[in-house]
Amino acid sequence: MKKLGTDLLKRGFAKMVKHGVVMDVTNVEQAQIAEDAGAAAVMALERVPADIRVQGGVARMSDPEMILEIKDAVSIPVMAKARIGHYVEAQVLESIGVDMVDESEVLTPADEVNHIDKRAFTAPFVCGARNLGEALRRIDEGAAMIRTKGEAGTGNVVEAVKHMRAVNEGIARVVGYKEMGLEAELIQMARNELKVPMELISEVAELKRLPVVNFAAGGIATPADAALMMQMGCDGVFVGSGIFKSGNPEVRAKAIVEATYNFDKADVIGEVSKNLGEAMVGINIDEIPEEKLLAKRGI
């Protein structure tokens, strides 16, 4: 009989990378640069989001051999992406020992209706969310970590800011209703708007935050971007294309780690932001055709 990881164990792993940076890497050399820079973990994938966006086509789980090579090369946790709803890709990633599976909208969805039942796995999962409803639905499915979706591969933090603000505003509403004793409104919010069990709403009201670690992702390209998301209440950051699509990946990686850890110290952020070289070329969100937006995948 398969042994399933408990929510406590899965969420415990997520807390281990709290206040850290998870960096997208496509090979062993990049993984070693990330580890040397102080990354809390790496996300192993064959193409960073910026390349997926440009090249198009169907984006799938990466070659397990490439993931294993990266696992053998570094001592920090290694994560990998599965398509939304593709539970067999997730089974494969779990079988090769990835530390966390990202059920990711960056890849082409396999199921347009259902997400993976994450409670059926021992490996913990991270999922993206644009608002409190999406976040809590993924947690109800068994996600041990949430991240903003942002708009991956753009180098533009505006969507990540929008999504984090929406989550924060949703939490504030829940807490406000609870403090005013508006139980009927909370029940209606849970049932009709958020579509999650009341137990999750009660947990949010008590904690005044999500019950799992919440990272920023999507469009983070500079140390200041990382610090901005941390000041908004994120527990850490994912950086995809922003490091290895920049002019000086080694220096930028270290700078983003420093800024994430010292997010409330403007002098430190200013110092590490000096002489970073060219940032990745960004994309304005309003220039992206509606059908090319990744964040709308998987609600």
Swiss-Prot record:
Cross-referenced CDD domains: pdxS (cd04727)
Top-level taxon: Archaea
Active-site residues annotated for this sequence: K81
Protein name per its UniProtKB record: Pyridoxal 5'-phosphate synthase subunit PdxS
EC numbers, comma separated: 4.3.3.6
A Pfam family this chain is assigned to: SOR_SNZ
Record bears the keyword Lyase: yes
Binding site for D-ribose 5-phosphate: D24, G153, G219, G240, S241
Complexes and interactors: In the presence of PdxT, forms a dodecamer of heterodimers.
Family that this chain belongs to: Belongs to the PdxS/SNZ family.
Enzyme class (EC, first level): lyase
Purpose of the protein: Catalyzes the formation of pyridoxal 5'-phosphate from ribose 5-phosphate (RBP), glyceraldehyde 3-phosphate (G3P) and ammonia. The ammonia is provided by the PdxT subunit. Can also use ribulose 5-phosphate and dihydroxyacetone phosphate as substrates, resulting from enzyme-catalyzed isomerization of RBP and G3P, respectively.
NCBIfam families (alphabetical): PRK04180.1, pyridoxal 5'-phosphate synthase lyase subunit PdxS
Keywords annotated in UniProt: Lyase, Pyridoxal phosphate, Schiff base
Pathway as given in its UniProt record: Cofactor biosynthesis; pyridoxal 5'-phosphate biosynthesis
Binding site for D-glyceraldehyde 3-phosphate: R165
Record-level Gene Ontology MF annotations: pyridoxal 5'-phosphate synthase (glutamine hydrolysing) activity
Keyword Lyase: yes
Annotated GO biological process: amino acid metabolic process; pyridoxal phosphate biosynthetic process; pyridoxine biosynthetic process
